Regions:
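Amphipathic alpha-helices that form helix-helix packing interfaces
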Residues: 9-12, 32, 39, 55-58
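Charged, low-complexity interaction regions
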Residues: 14-26, 43-45
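Generic detector of low-complexity/intrinsically disordered segments
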Residues: 7, 11-15, 41, 50
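Amphipathic alpha-helical binding modules
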Residues: 50-83
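Amphipathic alpha-helical coiled-coil segments
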Residues: 34-50
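Short, flexible coil/linker elements and helix-boundary hinge sites characteristic
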Residues: 19-20, 30, 40, 64, ...
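Short amphipathic alpha-helical heptad-repeat segments
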Residues: 1-13, 25-31
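Generic alpha-helical structural signal
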Residues: 1-4, 26, 42, 49, ...
Length: 83
């Protein structure tokens, strides 16, 4: 399941980074938040960290953009997740 979520998260973040003004941005952001809640419910805060670490590096390599600001979209899911 995590592999599918990772690919979906990767695609969503790439889309949001490259298209910040599109009409469906809020829908995409909402799905990113939902993925975070699913990961946390399944595997805890470590899963959030591991997933985002992997995604950040992939995005940096592929499009040269920093995904770290998008970590804040998962704030409020876990008390230990504060970005």
């Amino acid at each position: 399941m995590d592999a599918y979520l990772e690919e979906e998260l990767y695609d969503l973040l790439i889309y949001c980074i490259q298209n910040p003004q599109v009409p469906d941005f809020a829908v995409k952001k909402g799905r990113v938040e939902e993925i975070g809640r699913e990961l946390y419910a399944d595997s805890g805060a470590d899963a959030l960290e591991n997933m985002f670490f992997s995604i950040e590096h992939r995005i940096k390599e592929v499009i040269g953009s920093d995904a770290k600001p998008y970590r804040a979209w998962w704030n409020g899911i876990a008390s230990e997740w504060k970005y």
